[in-house]
Amino acid sequence: MKSFSLLASAGLATLASLPLTMAGVITPSYFDKHPLSRRQLSDAQVQRELGPQLSRGATIIGPGGPGWDDAIERFDNESRPTIRLVVVPAVESDIATVVKLANRFGIPFLVKNRGHALTNTIGRFRGIQIDMSRLTTITIQPGEPAESAWFQGGAWDKQAIEYLWDRGYVTVTGSCDCVGMMGPGLGGGHGRYQGLYGLISDNLINMNVVLADGSAVRVNATSNPDLWWGMQGAGHNLGIVTSFQSKIYPRKIDTWHYHSYTYTQDKLEAVFGALNTFHGNGDGSTPVLMGLNTGGFYIDPSVSQTEPVVSWVFGYAGPASEAEALLEPFSRLGPAAEQSGDVPYPGVATAMGTGQDQPLCQPGDAHVQVTSQFNVYNATAERALYQLFNRTIAAHPQLADSVAFHEGYSTAAVDRADPSASAVAFRDRKLLMFFDARLKPADAADPEVLGMAREFGRQVRRIWNEGAPDLKPATYVNYAAGDEPLESMYGYDAARLRRLRNIKRKYDPHGRFVYYNPIA
C-alpha cells in the first residue's frame, strides 16, 4: 500500500510546533470538571487539546491537510470509515493518550495498520483514526526455550519477512506481503509456515495492550490470562496491541519451489479431485512443507476471452525435486499453461501472486467479499460456482475482475495446538474460501452495480456452504463481510461465546471496540 510522507504531513501539527504543558499554561479542557461534549467539540479543538499531550514527533493530520489522502487510504472502499482526524503516534504511549482523550470527549477511535480490513462493519465508524505506520520496530531476542522477537504493532508482513530473513530467521506471517502482522493475528492468522509452526496467534508470547479505558497492560498466559485467551481469535474486540513478542525460528530452508498451473474449464472436476487426494480428503495429512496452495476462477485473455480458467499455484518449502514429486498428479492433467521456479522465502509471495506490487495488494477499489471454510472440495458445487461465475460476468462485465479463491494450507502444527487454549474458532476446518468481486470506484458508486456484486457474493457463499451439508457454515473472521451470524465467526459452542461476552464486558464495558465484527 502506498505510504505517505510523515515529513510532509508534520507541518500540520507536531509537538515541535505546539507548546508543552507546563506551569502557567492553560490546562486542557479535559481536566475540567465538566469537559466539552462530543457535539460541542470541533476537529480543530481536538487537535489543540490533543497535540500537547503527545510525544514530540507525533503527528495529527486534519481533513485536506498534507498527507490526508494517503493517511485515510484503504485497500477496500466498499464500506469506508468516516475519519475526522488522523493521529500518527511516534511512540507506543501516544496510543493510550489518544484513547483517554477520545473517551473524555466521547469520540470513537479506530486503529489502522495497513488498512486491509474487509468487513463492512467498519463503515459504521466516525471518529479519530490511530495510524500505526511509524511503530514498526523489530527487535530480536535470542533466548531459551525459544528465540523470539518483539514487533511493534505497525509491523507488516514484507517488512518482517525481509528483516528476519536477512538475520537468519523466519516466523509465521500472513500470506500477502502487504498486510499487517497483528491484524490477522488477532483473528488467528493463516500463513505459509503454519504447517510447521502454527497460526500467527499460536506463536505469541506477550502482548502490550491498550484497553478501552486507555490503560496499558501486559497480556500473556499468566498476566490477564482471560484477556490472553480472547485476544487470540477475537482480539479486534478487546484492545489495541501496541507491541507483541512472538516466536521466531532459525532459517533452515534456503529456497521455496513454486509451480502454477492454468487449466481450461473441462479439467475442473479432475483438478478438485486431485486436490482432495492431495489434502488427504480433509484428514490433515497435507504435506507439511507444502505451505500453501491457492487457486480459483478468473478470466485469462491469453486462454479465453469468454470462459474463466481454473488456475492454481503451489508453494513448497524445499527443492524442486521434492515438490515436483508431490505435484505430479497436477502436471498429468494437461494444463494449458504452467510456470515454475525457485526463490528465497522473501520472494515466494510475489511468485504466488500476493506480492507487494501485484494487483491483489493494490488499494483503492471496492471489494465485495464472502468467505467459507470446510474440509473437502465438492466438485459438483465448484462446477455450479463456475457456471454462476461464467453467467454473471458475461451479463455484467463490471464484475469481470471477480475472483473465487480457494486456500489450502498445511495444517500439521495448527492441528497440534489445543483448541481450548484460545478463542480461535474452527481450527479443525482445513480449507479456506474467499470470493472477491472487485469493483472500480465508479462502478462501486453505482447502487445497481454494487447490489449485483453483493448478490453475486451471496450466491457464491450459498453454493459453498450447501456443498458441505454436514457442516455448519464457518466464517474466517479476518475475511468476514460483516453480515454473517456471530456463531459462524466465533464458533457455535455456547460456553465459548458466553466466555467471550464476559471478557468483552469486563475489558470493554462501554463498547469502544465495536467496529470490527463485534461480538456484542
Swiss-Prot record:
GO molecular function, one term: oxidoreductase activity
Glycosylation-annotated residues: 77, 220, 378, 390
Domain (FAD-binding PCMH-type): residue spans on this chain: 79-251
Signal peptide start-end: 1-23
Entry keyword set: FAD, Flavoprotein, Glycoprotein, Oxidoreductase, Signal
UniProt pathway annotation: Polyketide biosynthesis
Pfam families for the chain: BBE, FAD_binding_4
EC number, as in UniProt: 1.-.-.-
Needed cofactors: FAD
Induction section of the entry: Expression is increased in rice-extract medium (REM) and is correlated with the production of pyriculol.
Enzyme class, broadest EC rank: oxidoreductase
Role of this protein: FAD-linked oxidoreductase; part of the gene cluster that mediates the biosynthesis of pyriculol and pyriculariol, two heptaketides that induce lesion formation upon application on rice leaves but are dispensable for pathogenicity. The highly reducing polyketide synthase synthesizes the heptaketide backbone of pyriculol and pyriculariol. Pyriculol and pyriculariol contain several hydroxyl moieties and double bonds, so it can be assumed that several reduction steps occur during biosynthesis.
PANTHER family according to UniProt: BINDING OXIDOREDUCTASE, PUTATIVE (AFU_ORTHOLOGUE AFUA_1G17690)-RELATED, FAD-BINDING PCMH-TYPE DOMAIN-CONTAINING PROTEIN
Assigned protein family: Belongs to the oxygen-dependent FAD-linked oxidoreductase family.
The protein's name: FAD-linked oxidoreductase OXR2
Gene: OXR2
